[in-house]
């Protein structure tokens, strides 16, 4: 399944949501490198989300130039930054993170965690903007660039989620992708699939889609939008 097929075939039904998750996860497991990566993430608790999400990233990355720019808000221990680097060795990859337990995570040396993950898989280290996504200095620094993909998985309160979508969606290039985690309460997911965080879903639904963004598809609790103008 390529991106065009995913967009065409997506439906908001329990059966469709279950199929997408199963097909995407199977694709990851068919690729030894991606399977080993996700297995390591799960074994060492270096990230959450679904195995299927890695294939979502591959579908988006396949549509972009090799040196595309990627920004993640909310890095945790680096799972997504590492996956994107594995799929796109020449990409320009940046993460925004306070490198602390902010948001309810356990205490850890998050800078060392991110380095360990990338070293383990012989991946080039990402650029890190240290701070909160709502910090003026962080916004100014991140806003010096425009990005082919912005991934929002930061603070899970209504206020922070709405701020992140409002601010960072403006940094996406026309034709680029805005990907948001934990925001699928409006969808008819099958029993057992996590819809995300209700406050995050509310914030996203109030802002998207709009005249600048069209929704393409979702996978479990992640939604994918494309900037159209």
Where are the regions that the model predicts?
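S-adenosylmethionine/decaboxylated-SAM
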Residues: 3-10, 24-48, 54-229
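Long, compositionally biased, charged low-complexity segments
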Residues: 10, 14-20
